[in-house]
């Protein structure tokens, strides 16, 4: 029943957060940037597949429980894959992480940590706020049908997925900070298009925002051991994940309260403010790192 669904969401979230942090840390330390981008492009495949599985099960059985049972089977399959692949993980060196109190104090004193966390918070706030509220904006403010609006939201996530796949190739030719800057610039362009009162431009803006989002998150994650040291990577990865999830959890409903009070016409403005916070975080981080290297 629904109560049990809410209760099991807690251990599911704890497990997902642990796997997320550990897997990102492992890939960041041992693989190239292209692998991190391709890893996160498959997040897009999963994010797209989940609603499709639920919709299919609802149409076939009329019961939402079957959708969750199907996803549970996928989760147990994932657990089995992770368990059987553990010997492969042990082939790679594991740096000593600073788990002591002194180590944690050292982490907090690393230069660039604060703007780095701001960037993670703001990025995830932009990503999920766009995905959750874009369809409503297109219907109520641009007069699109629900079908077209849903297609626009799907195009947004498709942009993230395809963009990350392509970014896997681009990461070999461009510096990490330039990939992030390019992504942030595309997000700003997409948001500006959403201010304009033309449905086709709003749809295009949504797709551009998705493409802009593509390189930012995996690139920031992959640079963690290089910017802050491999010995700090595991602890920092967890801290970054936690900060990102705070952005995911708090900002979309907060933006919903604002647009509910003042109207969905303020949705692009809310996205713009979050995007400017992302600009501040990424550029401040670049400045701190440049000063360290000087």
What spans do the regions from the language model cover?
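Cytoplasmic helix-loop-helix junction between adjacent transmembrane helices
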Residues: 8-42
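Loop-to-transmembrane helix entry/capping segments in MFS-fold secondary transporters
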Residues: 32-42, 146-147, 230-240
């Amino acid at each position: 029943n629904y109560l049990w669904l809410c209760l099991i969401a807690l251990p599911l979230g704890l497990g997902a957060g642990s796997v997320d942090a550990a897997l990102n840390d492992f890939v960041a330390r041992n693989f190239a940037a292209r692998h991190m981008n391709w890893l996160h492009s498959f997040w897009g495949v999963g994010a797209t597949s989940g609603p499709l599985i639920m919709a299919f099960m609802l149409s076939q059985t009329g019961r939402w429980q079957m959708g969750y049972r199907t996803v549970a089977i996928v989760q147990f399959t994932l657990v089995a894959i992770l368990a059987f692949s553990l010997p492969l993980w042990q082939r790679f060196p594991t740096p000593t992480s600073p788990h002591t109190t002194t180590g944690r104090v050292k982490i907090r004193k690393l230069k660039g940590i604060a703007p780095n966390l701001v960037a993670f918070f703001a990025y995830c706030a932009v990503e999920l706020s766009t995905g959750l509220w874009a369809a409503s904006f297109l219907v109520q403010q641009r007069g699109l049908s629900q079908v077209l609006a849903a297609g626009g939201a799907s195009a947004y996530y498709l942009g993230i997925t395809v963009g990350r796949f392509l970014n896997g190739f681009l990461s070999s030719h461009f510096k990490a900070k330039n990939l992030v800057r390019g992504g942030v610039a595309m997000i700003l362009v997409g948001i500006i298009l959403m201010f304009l009162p033309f449905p086709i431009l709003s749809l295009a803006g949504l797709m551009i925002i998705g493409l802009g989002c593509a390189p930012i998150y995996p690139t920031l994650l992959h640079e963690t051991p290089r910017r802050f040291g491999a010995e700090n990577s595991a602890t920092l990865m967890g801290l970054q994940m936690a900060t990102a999830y705070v952005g995911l959890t708090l900002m979309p409903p907060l933006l919903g309260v604002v647009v509910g009070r003042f109207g969905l016409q303020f949705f692009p403005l809310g996205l713009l403010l979050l995007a400017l916070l992302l600009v501040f975080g990424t550029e401040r981080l670049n400045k701190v790192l440049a000063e360290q290297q000087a």
